[in-house]
A protein has these predicted regions:
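Charge-rich, low-complexity N-terminal segments
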Residues: 1-160
């Protein structure tokens, strides 16, 4: 049996700032606010005969691209049953409980998730990471999303 290694990538630079609001119900949501989100990863792979399991640099670069692509945007969910989003003249019109908020389309990301939470972001960003990075001989890839010190969620992929 080959030896397994678990790599942890938790770099200070893997952060992005974004605005959002969480939707709690048909009539309740948070006020618009922002977070300095952090991304980190846990990678499990078999060690090769050279004592090497996975290239940190591949995953560090991929995590940085995810951060860069989401930095300084308003994040809106496109699949919420309680938020209707329409596009009109360079703006997203986000209607919740009878109130419409306007966001410039070039400063807003419409994400394929039901709510902008660390849980939903973890799954969404893990899928993007898996599309971009070569999974190679990885056995597990877990992506962590934090929205502040001491609070985070993760999503995990395991090889079949």
């Amino acid at each position: 049996m080959s030896q397994l290694a678990t790599l942890h990538i938790d770099k200070q630079a893997h952060k992005f700032s974004a605005a959002h609001f969480t939707i709690f119900s048909e009539t309740e949501r948070e006020r618009l606010h922002g977070h300095n989100y952090g991304l980190s990863a846990r990678i499990v792979a078999a060690m090769g005969d050279n004592g090497f399991s996975a290239d940190y640099n591949v995953y560090k670069r991929a995590l940085q691209r995810l951060c860069d692509n989401h930095d300084e945007y308003m994040l809106l969910p496109s699949q919420s049953r309680w938020l209707q989003v329409a596009e009109e003249e360079g703006e997203y019109l986000a209607t919740f409980n009878g109130r419409t908020l306007r966001f410039p389309t070039d400063e807003t990301l419409l994400l394929p998730i039901t709510n902008v939470t660390v849980e939903a972001l973890a799954h969404y960003l893990l899928n993007l990471l898996m599309e971009e990075a070569d999974m190679g001989d990885l056995l597990e890839l877990e992506l962590f999303v934090s929205s502040g010190d001491g609070q985070m969620s993760s999503a995990c992929w395991r090889a079949p």
